C-alpha cells in the first residue's frame, strides 16, 4: 500500500507548513490508517463516532482524532474523553452537550462552527447571521469546557472555480471580521480532495482530504 505514503508525500509537498492536513479515514480499514501513520500522518478525521472509537482503541495514542461528520448531541459522550476537534457544530444545543461531556472528563474540547456557505440545500451548517448570534451569546461565557477554535465550510459540489472562490472567500472575510473580537478563532477549515487547493488559495488553514490519500471509499461493515 505504498500509494498511501506516496499520496501523503505529494499532498504535503503541495501545501505550506501552516496548513493542517486532516486525513479523512472514514470507512477505511485500520491497516490503511496504520500505513498513513507510519508515513508520518497524525491527524485523522472520521464521520461516525462508533467507527472513530474503534479506531482510537486500536491505533497509537498520539493520533489527533477529528470528528468531521454531522454530530448528534446524544453521541458526544462516546468520544468526549479523546476527541481533539469537532468540525461540524451547527447548534447551541450541541455546544452545550459538548461542554457538559467535556466537563465530566475535565477537558476543554475545541470545536469549529459549521457555516453554510454552499448554495445546495442539502448541506448542514448555519447561515452567517446565526453564527454571529452564537459568538456573541452571553450564555457562551458559561460554556467553559469548550473552545470555539474557528469555522468550517463545505463548498458547493461543482467544478466551477469561480463559485468555489466566491464561497470560500466570503467565509475567509467573515473569519477575518470576527477574529479581532474572538482571538481564539484560529482555524479555518475549507477544502476537501476536489477543492482543497482553492480553499488554501482563499486562506484555509485546515483541509480534509480522503480519496486523494486513501483512494476510493471502502464501506466497512
Give the label of every model feature segment:
Residues 1-173, 177-194, 200-202:
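Conserved alpha/beta-domain cores
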Residues 197-201, 209, 213-216, 220-221:
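Expand to "…catalyze enediolate/carbanion chemistry for C-C bond making/breaking, isomerization
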Residues 206:
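Conserved, well-ordered active-site substructure
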Amino acid at each position: 500500500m505504498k500509494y498511501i505514503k506516496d499520496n501523503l508525500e505529494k499532498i504535503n509537498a503541495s501545501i505550506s507548513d501552516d496548513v493542517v492536513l486532516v486525513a479523512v479515514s472514514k470507512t477505511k480499514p485500520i491497516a490503511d490508517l496504520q500505513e498513513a501513520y507510519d508515513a508520518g500522518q497524525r491527524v485523522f478525521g472520521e464521520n461516525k463516532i462508533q467507527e472513530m472509537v474503534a479506531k482510537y482503541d486500536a491505533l497509537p495514542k498520539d493520533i489527533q482524532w477529528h470528528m468531521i461528520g454531522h454530530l448528534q448531541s446524544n453521541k458526544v459522550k462516546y468520544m468526549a474523553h479523546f476527541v481533539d476537534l469537532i468540525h461540524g457544530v451547527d447548534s447551541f444545543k450541541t455546544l452545550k452537550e459538548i461542554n457538559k461531556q467535556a466537563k465530566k472528563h475535565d477537558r476543554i474540547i475545541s470545536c469549529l462552527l459549521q457555516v453554510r456557505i454552499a448554495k445546495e440545500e442539502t448541506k448542514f451548517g448555519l447561515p452567517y447571521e446565526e453564527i454571529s448570534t452564537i459568538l456573541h451569546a452571553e450564555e457562551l461565557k458559561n460554556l467553559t469546557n469548550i473552545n470555539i477554535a474557528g469555522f468550517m465550510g463545505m463548498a458547493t459540489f461543482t467544478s466551477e472555480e469561480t463559485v468555489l472562490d466566491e464561497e470560500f472567500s466570503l467565509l475567509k472575510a467573515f473569519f477575518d471580521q470576527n477574529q479581532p473580537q474572538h482571538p481564539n478563532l484560529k482555524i479555518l477549515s475549507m477544502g476537501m480532495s476536489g477543492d482543497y487547493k482553492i480553499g488554501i488559495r482563499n486562506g484555509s488553514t485546515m483541509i480534509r482530504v480522503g480519496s486523494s490519500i486513501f483512494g476510493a471509499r471502502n464501506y466497512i461493515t
